[in-house]
């Protein structure tokens, strides 16, 4: 029993030191418990001690070692420690003071739990003696105090429950003395208290009782029979009462241990001593040792093993053969010496199962197995060292009582699916003993490898027109993993081929990787295409890789050449050539297209039938040329069968019939070579592109300059009829639009200018009028469409309007005039006939002259066109430096748009046809507007002194402008924006010129004759206007300087047959000062001091004869004037003189 407890205790001591790897649990249970008794809940206690138990594991515990596997065990799932059978401590541990069962349990989390179960002893056994009766023979000669050992009682219980004392039936002759052996057991000796006398009593009977330490104590009794014999005076005597010897373990049988010797001085049989084991010597000891009864030699009879038992006690007695012999006793203690006779023993326990398996994804440090090495030897003989042999990705981690095998590198099952490991253990004895154990570690598979294609790029060549379903190629991917991890399936990655899914072109077998064509390929449509094949395994998660497959479609000669030139009708082409064409004349060029490639698409030409003797064909370029000349006697037509064939293995061809006609009307032109139409086409496109580019640059520069000029010039000064006609006569360029004054003219030039004005002024009118009629297809406004409607508002000032048949044209051109004139320019005043509101007149002193017509009458008629009255506009002051936005002016002129339905939009074409001549109309409308202003309005020109500064500079220009150029500030207005009227009509920004006519004016108009009714006399009566009053014009809009040549007035006045119905065009600035009436003149002309021609004209007017009152100028009918001016304008338009061109440039 002690031999079993010592290794367990040693193991527990070693495990206790490994606090980081072990947890100790201690329990106790009483003996004699039935099987299935629950000792403890190890799972609960282990969890409380810090174990990380996985509840999902079916087996939470695994028993590593168990000192009593037949007695106790642990349930692997519940963790309950239970008894397997009834435990008898007396048999398990015998006399050991403590009886402990040790278990080592490993949890699923690789934590080790050491369990110690102490078996508690119960007083369940009573002391017993080896025999039922003890018989003794005591010589009567025994002296008092003689001690005779008695057989000891045996109690299997341990400790206090063992034999504690002996009792003898009370008497006077004998007594008992209790003694203790070295192992703690107690025995009794019979002591002779008094001398014996055999003759008195030769036999005694007593009872000896053995008692244990229980409560109540258990007892065992034995009978003692004492026979008093005759005396043998000398007893054998040992030299020593105790002997101690040692013997090596594994000593062979008959190995002497000790020789005992007891002396007896008696002679004969009384002195002959015999030896024997006496007392309590167990059976195991008797098996190991024996004593020679005659010699007293103790020898070895069994196999001594230090690990089984290393100390034995032998009780030996010696007695003589004489009667009444009293034996002598001694104790022999035999110690077994340990030798290195046990090699280390290696025990391997896998963590997961009986087989050592580990996943290839196990990280370094992962425990795969537990190794326990034991050596039954002691000391250095039992101290063992272990190591792992071989170059393997594992290592051995040693502890005091066990070792672990850990992963020490990267595992790859695909390279090594198993490893053969050898563990070697050796002790420290002399000689050294060692042992080895080999085992196999299986590497389990993980899905750690992607499928790998044999090559990343596959290419297959297939001819077009293949059969759908034809096999193309096979792709192969290998996955070194096992099972589902290594099973590879294939699929095509979705993509597009010519805007169609690739699945409509090819398919793949998911298991074998065979790729098939789903359609018949056409090389002319698709020469090659690519797609990707995806290979993925069946692992979780699945791994995949892809490869590119390129399908090249070879061309097959499946397309017949198609003749494209000359054009065929039902397979026949007709060609005309001159009859006098010579040899080598190019008749036609035969062209054929073949959609195949290479030799399959290379086309050559030939003539197979027909009049081949007259013509030849170039086999490469298809040129058909004459080989002889044709005379007058030649027939008029020839036939040729032209064949175009390709050069495929199976040649395909196309033929056409070419009819060649000889035509005498054509001029023979020998063709020296073929004309490269593509080159001509490219050259033409390049030329057109170059011309367009240059044109765009020119237009951009022109527009940029025009935009700058809009901000530069004072339009109110340059758009007078004087400036316009001056440019036309003198040949000034478009820079005149920047001018704000007229250069002085010499007297000689004055006369020439007057003649030119008289002629070219008429041409301007005809030119403008003629274009207006040419471009007008839509309905015009006639006099029948115009009627006068009485006004509801009474006005004190009325106006007389000069009649003009071209007023409708003026109204039609007003819209264009509004859009084309620069900002701030005056509109045609014939479109602004209205009554001036006296309350809105501005009497500023900045303006010198004021002209007005005074009319008498209760109501002012409104102008009605096509049944729709034109809106009225109130007059308001307008400063010359105030420039409205173009958009505002266009909006304000919307009332007069398209009065005659004429479109003023440019068609974008250069042709001057009836429908697309709007662009030309716009080029002439400016002149028409100016002429109509002259013909329809009689207003005296006025102006003021021009400031002294450069004509090309603005009011804000500085010295640096002449060097660095002008900025936006230079073109800003000089004066702030005036305050306008808040009337609704004012918002529309329509500026009206109100003209007041006096009674004298009415009479003057009437003097022209009752048949000459003008537009100004509609609704007027001659008697309402006194003839004595002089006309006074009140111009509501003018500018600082009004420039008007008097010669122009005289020329135009002559054209009006003496009835002055035309006035110089005034600039758009409100004239605010009144002019005194002068009976000697019809009109007062504004004087511009810098102009000498104006000065001379004023002098002529002041000093010339006064016309009689009956010859006062009346409003003239402009139809007659236009009739006379039109031929002049037509002549100027046809000649396109430089002056006309310059005038067009100015207008545009």
From Swiss-Prot:
SMART domains: CA
Regions that span the bilayer: 679-699
Binding site for Ca(2+) 12: 447, 449, 479, 481, 485, 537
Positions contributing to Ca(2+) 8 binding: 249, 307, 338, 341, 377
Disorder noted: Developmental and epileptic encephalopathy 9: A condition characterized by seizure with onset in infancy or early childhood, cognitive impairment, and delayed development of variable severity in some patients. Additional features include autistic signs and psychosis. The disorder is sex-limited, with the phenotype being restricted to females.
Localisation per UniProt entry: Cell membrane
Annotated positions binding Ca(2+) 7: 249, 305, 307, 341-342
Region forming the signal peptide: 1-21
Name of this protein: Protocadherin-19
Organism superkingdom: Eukaryota
Entry binding sites for Ca(2+) 13: 464, 522, 524, 558-559
Gene that this polypeptide is encoded by: PCDH19
Residues at which Ca(2+) 15 binds: 557, 559, 594, 596, 600, 646
UniProt function note: Calcium-dependent cell-adhesion protein.
Keyword Transmembrane helix belongs to the record: yes
Topology relative to the membrane: Single-pass type I membrane protein
Residue numbers binding Ca(2+) 9: 340, 342, 375, 377, 381, 427
Residues bound to Ca(2+) 5: 140, 199, 230-231, 233, 266
Presence of the UniProt keyword Kinase in the record: no
Binding site for Ca(2+) 4: 140, 199, 233
């Amino acid at each position: 029993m002690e031999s079993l407890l010592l290794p367990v205790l040693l193991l527990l001591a070693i495990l206790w030191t490994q606090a980081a790897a072990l947890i100790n649990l201690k329990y106790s249970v009483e003996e004699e418990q039935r099987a299935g008794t629950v000792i403890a809940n190890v799972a609960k206690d282990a969890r409380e001690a810090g174990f990380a138990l996985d509840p999902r594991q079916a087996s939470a515990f695994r028993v590593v070692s168990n000192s009593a596997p037949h007695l106790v065990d642990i349930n692997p799932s519940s963790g309950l420690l239970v008894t397997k059978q009834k435990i008898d401590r007396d048999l398990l541990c015998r006399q050991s003071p403590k009886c402990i069962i040790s278990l080592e349990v490993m949890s699923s989390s690789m934590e080790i739990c050491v369990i110690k179960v102490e078996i508690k002893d119960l007083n369940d056994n009573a002391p017993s003696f080896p025999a039922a009766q003890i018989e003794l023979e005591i010589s009567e000669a025994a002296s008092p105090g003689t001690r005779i050992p008695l057989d000891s009682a045996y109690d299997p219980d341990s400790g206090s429950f063992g034999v504690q004392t002996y009792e003898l039936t009370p008497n006077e002759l004998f007594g008992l003395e209790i003694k203790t052996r070295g192992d703690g057991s107690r025995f009794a000796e019979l002591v002779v208290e008094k001398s014996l006398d055999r003759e008195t009593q030769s036999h005694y009977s007593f009872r000896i009782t053995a008692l244990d330490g229980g409560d109540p104590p258990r007892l065992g009794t034995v009978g003692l029979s004492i026979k008093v014999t005759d005396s043998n005076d000398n007893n054998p005597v040992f030299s020593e009462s105790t002997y101690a010897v040692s013997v090596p373990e594994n000593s062979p049988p008959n190995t002497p241990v000790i020789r005992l010797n007891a002396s007896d001085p008696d002679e004969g049989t009384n002195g002959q001593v015999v030896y024997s084991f006496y007392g309590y010597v167990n059976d195991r000891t008797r098996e190991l040792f024996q004593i020679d009864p005659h010699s007293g030699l103790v020898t070895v009879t069994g196999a001594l093993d230090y690990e089984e038992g290393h100390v034995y006690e032998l009780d030996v007695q010696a007695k003589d053969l004489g009667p009444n012999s009293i034996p002598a006793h001694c104790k022999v203690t035999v110690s077994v010496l340990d030798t290195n006779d046990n090699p280390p023993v290696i025990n391997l326990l896998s963590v997961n199962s009986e087989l050592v398996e580990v996943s290839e994804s196990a990280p370094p440090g992962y425990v795969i197995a537990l190794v326990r090495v034991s050596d039954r030897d002691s000391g250095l003989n039992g101290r063992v060292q272990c190591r792992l042999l071989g170059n393997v990705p594992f290592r051995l981690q040693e502890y005091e009582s066990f070792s672990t095998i850990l992963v020490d590198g990267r595992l790859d099952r695909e390279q090594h699916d198993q490893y053969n490991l050898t563990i070697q253990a050796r002790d420290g004895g002399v000689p050294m003993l060692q042992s080895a154990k080999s085992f196999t570690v299986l590497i389990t598979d993980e899905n750690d490898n992607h499928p790998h294609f044999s090559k990343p790029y596959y290419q297959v060549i297939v001819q077009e027109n293949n059969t759908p379903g034809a096999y193309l190629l096979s792709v192969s991917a290998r996955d070194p993993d096992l099972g589902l991890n290594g099973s590879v399936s294939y699929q095509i990655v979705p993509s597009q081929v010519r805007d169609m899914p690739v699945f409509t072109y090819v398919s793949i077998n998911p298991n074998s990787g065979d790729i098939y064509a789903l359609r018949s390929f056409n090389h002319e449509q698709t020469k090659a295409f690519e797609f990707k094949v995806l290979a993925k395994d069946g692992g979780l998660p699945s791994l995949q890789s892809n490869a590119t497959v390129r399908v090249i479609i070879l061309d097959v000669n499946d397309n017949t050449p198609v003749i494209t030139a000359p054009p065929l009708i039902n397979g026949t082409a007709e060609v005309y050539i001159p009859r006098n064409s010579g040899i080598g004349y190019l008749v036609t060029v035969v062209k054929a297209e073949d959609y195949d490639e290479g030799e399959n698409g290379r086309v050559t030409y030939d003539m197979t039938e027909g009049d081949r003797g007259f013509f030849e064909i170039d086999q490469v370029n298809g040129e058909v040329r004459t080989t002889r000349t044709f005379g007058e006697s030649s027939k008029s037509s020839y036939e040729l069968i032209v064949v175009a064939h390709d050069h495929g293995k199976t040649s395909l061809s196309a033929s056409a019939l070419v009819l060649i006609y000889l035509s005498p009307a054509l001029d023979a032109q020998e063709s020296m070579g073929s004309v490269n139409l593509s080159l001509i086409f490219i050259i033409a496109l390049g030329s057109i592109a170059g011309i367009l580019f240059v044109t765009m640059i020119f237009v951009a520069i022109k527009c940029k300059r025009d935009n700058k000029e809009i901000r530069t010039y004072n339009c109110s000064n340059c758009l007078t009829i004087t400036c316009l006609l001056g440019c036309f006569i003198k040949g000034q360029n478009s820079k005149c639009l920047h001018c704000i004054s007229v250069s002085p003219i010499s007297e000689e030039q004055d006369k020439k200018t007057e003649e030119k004005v008289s002629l070219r002024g008429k041409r301007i009118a005809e030119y403008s009028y003629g274009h207006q009629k040419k471009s007008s297809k839509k309905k015009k406004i006639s006099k029948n469409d115009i009627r006068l409607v009485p006004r509801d508002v009474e006005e004190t000032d009325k106006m007389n309007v000069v009649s003009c048949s071209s007023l409708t044209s003026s109204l039609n051109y007003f819209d264009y005039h509004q859009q084309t004139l620069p900002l701030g320019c005056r509109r045609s005043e014939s479109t602004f006939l209205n009554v001036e509101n006296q309350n809105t007149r501005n009497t500023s002193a900045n303006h010198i002259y004021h002209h007005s017509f005074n009319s008498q009458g209760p109501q002012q008629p409104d102008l009605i066109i096509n049944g729709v009255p034109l809106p009225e506009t109130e007059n308001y002051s307008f400063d010359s430096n105030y420039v409205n936005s173009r958009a505002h002016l266009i909006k304000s002129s919307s009332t007069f748009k398209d009065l005659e339905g004429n479109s003023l939009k440019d068609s974008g074409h250069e042709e001057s046809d009836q429908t697309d001549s709007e662009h030309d109309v716009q080029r002439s409308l400016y002149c028409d507007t100016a002429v109509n202003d002259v013909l329809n309005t009689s207003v005296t020109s006025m102006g003021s002194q021009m400031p002294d500064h450069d004509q090309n500079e603005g009011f804000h220009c500085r010295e640096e402008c002449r060097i660095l150029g002008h900025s936006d500030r230079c073109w800003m207005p000089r004066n702030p924006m005036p305050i306008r009227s808040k009337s609704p009509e004012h918002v529309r920004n329509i500026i009206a010129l109100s003209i007041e006519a006096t009674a004298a004016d009415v009479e003057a108009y009437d003097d022209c004759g009752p048949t000459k009714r003008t537009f100004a006399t509609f609704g007027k009566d001659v008697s309402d206007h006194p003839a004595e009053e002089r006309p006074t014009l009140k111009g509501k809009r003018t500018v600082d300087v009004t420039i008007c040549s008097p010669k122009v007035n005289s020329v135009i006045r002559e054209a009006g047959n003496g009835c002055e119905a035309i006035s110089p065009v005034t600039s758009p600035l409100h004239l605010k000062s009144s002019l005194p009436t002068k009976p000697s003149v019809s009109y007062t002309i504004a004087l511009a001091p810098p102009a000498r021609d104006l000065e001379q004209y004023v002098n002529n007017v002041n000093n010339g004869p006064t016309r009689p009152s009956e010859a006062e100028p009346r409003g003239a009918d402009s139809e007659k004037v236009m009739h006379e001016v039109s031929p002049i304008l037509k002549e100027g338009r046809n000649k396109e003189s430089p002056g006309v061109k310059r005038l067009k440039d100015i207008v545009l």
